[in-house]
From Swiss-Prot:
NCBIfam families cross-referenced by the UniProt entry: PRK05738.1-3 (NF004359), PRK05738.1-5 (NF004360), PRK05738.2-4 (NF004363)
Similarity remark: Belongs to the universal ribosomal protein uL23 family.
Domain of life: Bacteria
Name this protein carries in UniProt: Large ribosomal subunit protein uL23
Transmembrane annotation, as ranges: none
CC terms in the record's Gene Ontology section: ribonucleoprotein complex; ribosome
GO terms for MF: rRNA binding; structural constituent of ribosome
Record-linked InterPro entries: Nucleotide-bd_a/b_plait_sf (IPR012677), Ribosomal_uL23-like (IPR013025), Ribosomal_uL23/eL15/eS24_sf (IPR012678)
Organism in which the protein naturally occurs: Mesorhizobium japonicum (strain LMG 29417 / CECT 9101 / MAFF 303099)
Subunit structure: Part of the 50S ribosomal subunit. Contacts protein L29, and trigger factor when it is bound to the ribosome.
Alphabetical keyword list: Ribonucleoprotein, Ribosomal protein, RNA-binding, rRNA-binding
One BP term from GO: translation
């Protein structure tokens, strides 16, 4: 998966209450492609936003079972990346990519 473009690696910023609290510790949370690796995520964030990344932590949130009109379906799995930035660096996720 080394041929993924930077915009294909980072799907969207994850704006939640928990990610807002993490921003106080110089961390930003992104939804990323399922097959993206930590080095690819680091390279994409550094290239797109022009910041220095100290660490990347990833997690996969399993999709929930949902019922719609009596039919049982399943939401897709989502991979998230918690990116820790260097001191003095920041990303304004409200501006978008």
């Amino acid at each position: 998966m080394t041929d993924l473009r930077h915009y294909d690696v980072i799907v969207s910023p994850a704006i939640t209450e928990k990610s807002t609290m993490a921003s106080e510790q110089n961390q930003v949370v992104f939804n990323v492609a399922k097959k993206a690796s930590k080095p690819e995520i680091k390279a994409a964030v550094e290239a797109l936003f022009g910041v220095k990344v100290m660490a990347v932590n990833t997690l996969v949130r399993k999709g929930k079972i949902k019922r719609f009109r009596g039919t049982i379906g399943r939401q897709s799995d989502v991979k998230k990346a918690i990116v820790t930035l260097a001191d003095g660096q920041s990303i304004d996720v409200a501006t978008g990519l």
